Amino acid sequence: MNISITRFLLLTLSLAIVSCSSATDDLDPTKNWSASKIYTEAKAQMLDGNYEQAAKLYESLQTRYPYGIYSQQAELEQIYSYYKQGEKASAISEADRFIKAHPSHPGVDYAYYMKGLANFDDDLGLFGVYSQSDLAQRDSKPYRDAFETFKELVTRFPKSKYTPDAVVRMRYIVNALAKGDVITARYYYKRQAYLAAVDRAKEVLSQYPKSPQVEEAIYIMAKSYQAMHLTKLSEDAFRVLNRDFPNSRFLKNKPSINTPWWKKIL
């Protein structure tokens, strides 16, 4: 009796699974589509700005036809669809997966570029970096990750069509990070945390020696040493400032570090 009941239940479950599978297939209009047709439709959705629908089609293509040129191209375009949806983590993950699986693919430079772009928080903009509100706690890791990815792209693919833009973004990142450190150093100085101000200013000199922010970083060091009554170090810093930036506005006008940054340059 128990065996019969068990067989009956298993049969019922099997029928239910088949039924559900059939129902799911009936709801999928792409079930009989070729790889070419799915890709073409996904591309059309992408061009129309329907990135979520395009992503679903690319996923379907990769699941059904995991091998061949359409699948690999779908992987690349999937990165872009995630990026345009604002799913930056997914875009980065997809780019990493493509780079690892297809290191010699002709389009791998695009994967590097999109990974860098996803990390490069384009919505933050310059004024996000200038803001003092939470700069001391701001996470700069995405910027640094973007820089390293763009650097790898530029190094490995110097002739890539994405390299010129990557170089521009790398320069932006360096200046943005340097500005962030200078603002943080100024923040520490205002709160009489002079040693912390010196340490942050030194980071600008060591990490971003060619950035325009070096000038103010040296000035903050000089003023911080002065506030700590470290006369020799303060004089040395002012001497370096005078040598490297003889026309420095900090030497001419001696603006207060407590003066808002925008008043110093306007």
In which residue ranges do the predicted regions lie?
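Bacterial N-terminal signal peptides that target proteins for export
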Residues: 1-9
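Bacterial N-terminal signal peptides
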Residues: 9-17
